[in-house]
Amino acid sequence: MDEDNLETALQTYRAQLQQVELALGAGLDASEQADLRQLQGDLKELIELTEASLLSVRKSKLLSTVDQESPAQEDAEYLAFQKAIAEEVEAPGAPCNDSETAPGSEVQPGSTSSALEEEEEDPDLEELSGAKVNAPYYSAWGTLEYHNAMVVGAEEAEDGSACVRVLYLYPTHKSLKPCPFFLEGKCRFKENCRFSHGQVVSVDELRPFQDPDLSLLQTGSACLAKHQDGLWHPARITDVDNGYYTVKFDSLLLKEAVVEGDSILPPLRTEATESSDSDTGDASDSSYARVVEPSTVDTGTCSSAFAGWEVHTRGIGSKLLVKMGYEFGKGLGRHAEGRVEPIHAVVLPRGKSLDQCAEILQKKTKRGQAGSNRPPKCRRSGSRPEGRPPPRNVFDFLNEKLQSQVPGTPDAGVDTPERRNKDMYHASKSAKQALSLQLFQTEEKIERTQRDIRGIQEALTRNTGRHNMTTAHLQEKLEGAQRQLGQLRAQEADLQRKQRKADTHRKMTEF
């Protein structure tokens, strides 16, 4: 319906609504009022829909009017833009001291031709916007891969070369996934966004778009499959049924899925087993990463210990390194500036902290240095096991006997209080734990004895003046319990004194 018909219908509906409202105010019976109220609601809803339709028609007319006026403005702006670019191109060709040319001076033919070329290239770059191409991508480990992408718009590099911004169609990780808010112009994170805002690549590096060839996919072949998160993960086809592919992802965190043909494509890098000559001669495989065969690799300065542990495994580590472009004998990294020798594994003691492990390694290092600086004779004498005592001779025996016969010197086998105190002062961790255990047991015995004493005292209170024999027996039992309590308290005080002495030594020696 056009605008006039909608306005006429809207006036008719409003007039009918006024008549219904007048009828409701006339005081009809309940059944008629219910019908009129329902009719009133329907008319209001119809009026709202008609007003919305009328508003959309008016908007479309305004937009068409603006579209008819805008081409003239766009043509003028485009001509001004081309003129500004031509001036920028002419500026580098002029001498530094003659930035302003005199009137009537001739323009060099080279600058004119370059300006014309620039004017011819700009429309081409604008035409590339929205086109599908095969664009390069450098992975995190420096491997060059070509992904199918779409051109978003033209960009200008720092050196002035022609570049375009592309968005990859088959993102394999989150940094390649296009940001949905960037496409709408609403992303607030800009360069700090986790998703891709496009990558600027040179126009010279672009290649023609390659349609995925699904005819190569069959049961058991490797592929890239689209997951629910929007990323394309490496997988392997387990079944094909009427255009539906059952895939099992390489990652154990992803479940098996059934996808259609638009959610699967061949892998970006094939598992080629051909020689390097055939790889360079085949132009169809130019979009894949270069695979270096182990048979043609020079070992260089790397030692033979590199990847030596793979004699016990399937060698998947070195195969992955080769697929990522690593060449044996060279350093790691994109420019081969990394380390060459492998990192040796060090087995650390179980249940020890990192500080304790570092201390053990330092002791081993110092012991090895001391052993290397020691003379050969001393090294042989130091090779005796630590548990074996040193050899004894006659003089050691005589010295022990003479020292034991000196008056005032305690015997080596007698455990005197002074020796006990000294040993406790230098007590080890296990001795301190045993001391704490003894103190805990003594406190439990004291509590048990105190409960027994209270029970005996209650029994004495009950039997006072009744049974003399029972009272005497309870009195004797009470005295024995009190003596035992005194001994336990003395033992507790002695253990507490030893514990304080050990704590004092620990506080004075630990910083």
Curated annotation (Swiss-Prot):
Comp. bias intervals (Acidic residues): 116-127
Biased composition (Basic and acidic residues): 491-511
Segments of this protein annotated with the region Disordered: 92-129, 266-291, 363-393, 490-511
Keywords (A to Z) from UniProt: Acetylation, DNA-binding, Metal-binding, Nucleus, Phosphoprotein, Repressor, Transcription, Transcription regulation, Zinc, Zinc-finger
Cellular compartments annotated: Nucleus
N-acetylmethionine modified-residue sites: M1
Single Gene Ontology BP annotation: negative regulation of DNA-templated transcription
Composition skew (Polar residues), residue ranges: 98-115
Gene3D superfamilies linked: 2.30.30.1190, 2.30.30.140
Complex and partners: Interacts with CHD4/Mi-2; the interaction is direct.
Role, per record: Transcription repressor that specifically binds the 5'-GGAG[GA]A[GA]A-3' consensus sequence. Represses transcription by recruiting the chromatin multiprotein complex NuRD to target promoters. Negatively regulates expression of EGFR, a gene involved in cell proliferation, survival and migration. Its ability to repress genes of the EGFR pathway suggest it may act as a tumor suppressor.
Stated name of the protein: Zinc finger CCCH-type with G patch domain-containing protein
